[in-house]
């Protein structure tokens, strides 16, 4: 068997998430169906580095799969790209070692979250940015977001019921920029891994801080007390993008 690593992007609006699930459309299943057709009906299993939720987009998701034969990477990329649905794009494909695993190989992820604070909202962006048409103090949020950098126990920012026991993660970058129009905000988070709904919960909290409904120091309190009830609401998924996955050499 020959193992391939692929970088893909997708519009998450019409998917129930990356991971295959019964009675719902998923990115994993669509790519597996295309690869199975290319493999003359023999089933191919796809593994993903990140399991994005329903409505979440990806600019640089990484997958791997095995084929029973070796094929030129560009020809394979072209075939997979052109035969996949329009809301999936295959950016690149490369041969990798047989023991490479896109999820378990050491890597870091970067996510971006886009907020549209325009009035009225732009209906063309409704699936690609979370609308928040309320007053926001950007400087307060920029101070608060830096408190998330470093190694912390992020229990207070994860969804209840998660099966992950170790909730300590390292965030190497947490930043917020505003575009030149002042309408769109982009939150960026890079780190060695993120808990279930962690980014959306952090953004929901930062928006509350920006709206003066929580103090800047609320971030410190949430990290100290590890209490989800102290954090803000979970931001909608439509503003979230898996931007990039970087593997260590």
Swiss-Prot record:
InterPro entries: PsdUridine_synth_cat_dom_sf, PsdUridine_synth_TruA, PsdUridine_synth_TruA_a/b_dom, PsdUridine_synth_TruA_C, TruA/RsuA/RluB/E/F_N. It comes from the Bacteria. Its EC number is 5.4.99.12. SUPFAM superfamilies: Pseudouridine synthase. The active site is at 53 (nucleophile). Keywords: Isomerase, tRNA processing. GO terms for biological process: tRNA pseudouridine synthesis. CDD domains: PseudoU_synth_EcTruA (cd02570). Pfam families: PseudoU_synth_1. It is an enzyme of class 5 (isomerase). Substrate binds at residue 111. It catalyses: uridine(38/39/40) in tRNA = pseudouridine(38/39/40) in tRNA. GO terms for molecular function: RNA binding; tRNA pseudouridine(38-40) synthase activity. Formation of pseudouridine at positions 38, 39 and 40 in the anticodon stem and loop of transfer RNAs. Belongs to the tRNA pseudouridine synthase TruA family. Homodimer. This is tRNA pseudouridine synthase A.
